[in-house]
């Protein structure tokens, strides 16, 4: 249990940030999921549109330290390469 007033405030701040970050992480995962579902269904046009929405979501999450920037870039790259495979 926090003893000092500053520690209590820090605890409140952490709780608020955690809630915000959870929301952002969920939103990011949802956008990635739509891309993966489109890829799984074999619909290239839908996958391209979904990736156009997912890429900014991933990069925003990376800017806000929800995921590492390299992890976000890697995810975008792998999704894009999977979409490229659909065209062949």
Swiss-Prot record:
Question: What are the disulfide bonds?
Answer: none
**Annotated HAMAP family:** Ribosomal_bS20
Q: Which GO terms describe its cellular component?
A: cytosol; small ribosomal subunit
Query: Which SUPFAM superfamilies has this protein been placed in?
Result: Ribosomal protein S20
Q: Which gene encodes it?
A: rpsT
* Sorted UniProt keywords: Ribonucleoprotein, Ribosomal protein, RNA-binding, rRNA-binding
The UniProt similarity line reads: Belongs to the bacterial ribosomal protein bS20 family.
Coiled-coil regions listed in the entry? none
Q: Domain of life of the organism in this record?
A: Bacteria
Per its database record, what is this protein's job? Answer: Binds directly to 16S ribosomal RNA.
The ranges of region (Disordered) come to 1-33
Q: Which InterPro entries match?
A: Ribosomal_bS20, Ribosomal_bS20_sf
UniProt protein name: Small ribosomal subunit protein bS20
């Amino acid at each position: 249990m926090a003893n000092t007033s500053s520690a209590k405030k820090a605890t409140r701040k952490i709780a608020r940030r955690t809630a915000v970050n959870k929301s952002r992480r969920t939103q990011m995962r949802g956008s990635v999921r739509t891309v993966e579902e489109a890829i799984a269904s074999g619909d290239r046009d839908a996958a391209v549109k979904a990736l156009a929405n997912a890429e900014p979501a991933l990069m925003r999450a990376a800017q806000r330290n929800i995921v590492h920037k390299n992890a976000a870039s890697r995810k975008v790259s792998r999704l894009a390469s999977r979409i490229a495979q659909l065209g062949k």
